[in-house]
Design a protein with these regions (language model features):
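Extracytoplasmic/lumenal domain signature
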Residues: 55-68, 100-123, 137, 141-143, ...
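Mature N-terminal segment immediately following signal peptide/propeptide cleavage
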Residues: 22-70, 83-86, 522-523
């Protein structure tokens, strides 16, 4: 098998501490972090499965977790977004109920399970979800319990340290193996508004977490602090505040997505969210640094190294949802360590990893101003000179879309009543088209970087949103209509501002988006040139419509891709229930495997068994908010 020779930098960031007897080849065959390596590349050096034989992939095993909720019994709907890890001969994964399972990676048989016993009936703003767990091995200990640990951050904001061999909580960590992450955080006023959804980051003897905070509830949202804890004891080592604490009442700016780590440079990279609330900023004047940014901190001290803001004074929920991807850019005969950062606007920023300076250049361009009383929108926003925007940046009545003339005309009439001056059109009482909407562009799925080919592959959404500011004296009837189901929109109060808000996909009477398809795409960017190599629709509406004649390519999507040395990109994500393999260099679809439920998760790949067989695994449990078929499956594929 051909294995890509990793650079020293890549190897240090990709492989955690292993016991003395573990072979380096075993480490390369692992998927040791949520995104494959600590730098978020989503790349595997395995090529046993490749372009010539991927068509032969078959299901190897299927595991049922039993953890699924359709919302009919009062519990939130489940969202199976986890990506397993494989390290130290075991697969570790989390479920929507936040349980942890240890599994034999060759057979799919369960070794142990751990239940943190979250309240399944709590109104969590993010639903029932957990994206993954993190492995850590103590380099100073050779034997004994909890030498190797699994860190789990739960939806009810607790951090657990578990013995990787048994699943038992590590008694020397926090209190009985857990930490209450709500402790020390200001302005938490109800259960379910301060949460954890992503896998923690680890570097040296630190475990680092951000938080997920409910959007649009009020001005004084909880503090979005990022904190590092001692991986052995659970003691707080440092905290960093994206929004300075003295800027009350503004909160949030939190890091709810995955943190990336550069072990060689001793740096961590944070994708920060929006300041509160998302759609009205009169109590948070200015750019609101360091919200809506990618930020580099010293891992040892938590001190700011550099920051780069992707959106000034956010009014669109354009938080930095994608994990920063670390790689090496080869261009014009030189190599540059970079951070590749996408965001919901559909723009892709490539920054020098050490300085935060744009590699291709960025310019501040004028954008529409706000006509809402008290709102001082930023007059400019940053746009990268390269690559070009991945998503369309404006929707007008001229390109209103419908599946038939009546549907198109209904969309056109609706759009005529809404403000649409291009991307960054400010929210208004009249109503505004936000395009791209708050689903992106790029979302938490991020993208995958094949460094040998210099190709960055990502999925995007091309969905318009209809956003309204609701004067305070008109808000209660709108909220009641939403609660009763007579209004389809998501409605939030934005307490502390003069306006509530509503948002929904800008749709036709049949419920289809008013923008032209594809509504979801898979795109490859050649970073050596800063240009788009190829783009293809992702998925079809075949599982959403009864008439095959009305199947449309390119659906909304959540999840993400991985890339391999075998020249393959694996991704599910779309609203049809398939895992697909694409040729990374051309975008040609080479294979697809039917899933029993929605695949709104990122796949992963690894070697297992005496002969080192390559498997590709994905969680197929659907997504309550996206509306795909729910289930509880984890499925592994391999060659016969």
């Amino acid at each position: 098998m051909r294995l890509l020779v990793l650079t020293a930098i890549g190897l240090m960031s990709a492989i955690p501490h292993f016991a003395a007897g573990e072979a380096r080849s075993e480490a390369i065959g692992n998927w040791a972090f949520y995104a494959g390596d600590a730098g978020g590349s989503r790349y595997s050096p395995l090529d046993q499965i490749n372009k010539t034989n991927v068509v032969e992939l078959k299901p190897a095993w299927e595991l049922h977790t039993g953890d699924v909720s359709d919302g009919s019994d009062g519990r939130p709907k489940s969202e199976f977004e986890t990506t397993p890890i494989v390290v130290a001969g075991t697969m570790f994964l989390s479920t929507p109920f936040n349980r942890v399972l240890a599994v034999d990676p060759e057979t799919g048989k369960e070794k142990w399970s751990f239940d943190p016993k979250i309240d399944l009936r709590e109104h969590y703003s993010e639903g029932l979800v957990n994206r993954g767990v993190t492995f850590w091995s103590d380099p100073g200990v050779t034997d004994g319990p909890c030498r190797q640990r699994i860190f789990l951050a739960t939806i009810d904001a607790r951090l657990f340290a578990l013995d990787a061999l048994t699943g038992h909580p590590c008694s020397d960590f926090g209190i009985g193996g857990q930490i209450d992450l709500k402790a020390g955080i200001a302005n938490i006023k109800r259960g379910g508004e301060y949460e954890e959804t992503s896998a923690p980051a680890v570097i040296d003897d630190l475990v680092i977490v951000g938080s997920s905070i409910a959007d649009n509830d009020r001005v004084d949202s909880p503090d979005g602090a990022v904190r590092a804890f001692d991986a052995k004891t659970g003691k707080l080592r440092w905290s960093w505040h994206p929004i300075p604490e003295n800027l009350a009442p503004t909160g949030a700016g939190n890091v709810w997505s995955t943190i990336s780590v550069d072990a060689q440079r001793g740096m961590v990279f944070l994708p920060t969210g929006s300041a509160s609330p998302d759609y009205h900023g009169f109590k948070r004047p200015g750019d609101n640094k360091w919200a809506n940014s990618v930020v580099a901190l010293s891992a040892r001290t938590g001190e700011l190294v550099w920051g780069f803001q992707l959106v000034h004074h956010d009014l669109w929920d354009y938080d930095t949802a994608a994990q920063p991807v670390l790689g090496v850019l080869r261009r014009e005969g030189s190599e540059t360590p970079v951070v590749i950062q996408g965001n919901k606007t559909g723009n892709l920023f490539v920054l020098n990893r050490e300085t935060g300076k744009p590699v291709f250049g960025v310019e501040e361009r004028p954008v529409p101003r706000s006509d809402t009383e008290g709102e001082d929108a930023s007059p400019t926003q940053p746009f990268p000179l390269l690559p070009p925007p991945l998503a369309p940046l404006q929707l007008t009545t001229n390109n209103a879309w419908g599946i038939n003339p009546e549907e198109r005309e209904a969309c056109r009439v609706k759009m005529e009543k809404l403000k649409s001056e291009g991307i960054f059109t400010a929210p208004s009482v009249q109503g505004t088209i936000a395009f791209p909407g708050n689903l992106g562009g790029m979302n938490w799925s991020s993208g995958a970087f094949d460094q040998s080919r210099q190709l960055f592959v990502t999925n995007i959404n091309n969905l318009p949103m209809e956003v309204h500011l609701i004067p305070r004296d008109q808000y209660k009837p709108v909220e009641k209509a939403a609660q009763q189901g007579t209004l389809r929109a998501e409605v939030s109060p934005q307490h502390g501002t003069p306006y509530g808000m509503s948002r929904e996909v800008l749709h036709s009477p049949l419920g289809l988006p008013c923008s032209p398809p594809p509504w979801g795409e898979l795109i490859a960017i050649d970073l050596s040139k800063g240009s788009i190599r190829w783009r293809v629709p992702l998925g079809t509406t075949a599982d959403m419509v009864k008439d095959p004649a009305h199947v449309i390519p390119g659906t909304p999507n959540l999840g993400g891709p991985i890339v391999t040395a075998g020249g393959l990109t694996f991704i599910a994500s779309a609203m049809d229930n398939y895992l697909r393999a694409f040729d990374t260099e051309t975008g040609q679809e080479l294979w697809k495997g039917r899933l029993p439920a929605g695949g709104q998760a990122m796949p992963m790949t690894y070697l297992a068994g005496q002969n080192g067989k390559q498997f590709v695994v994905i969680a197929a449990g659907g997504h309550g908010k996206l509306g795909t078929k729910l289930g509880d499956s984890v499925i592994a594929y391999s060659l016969p």
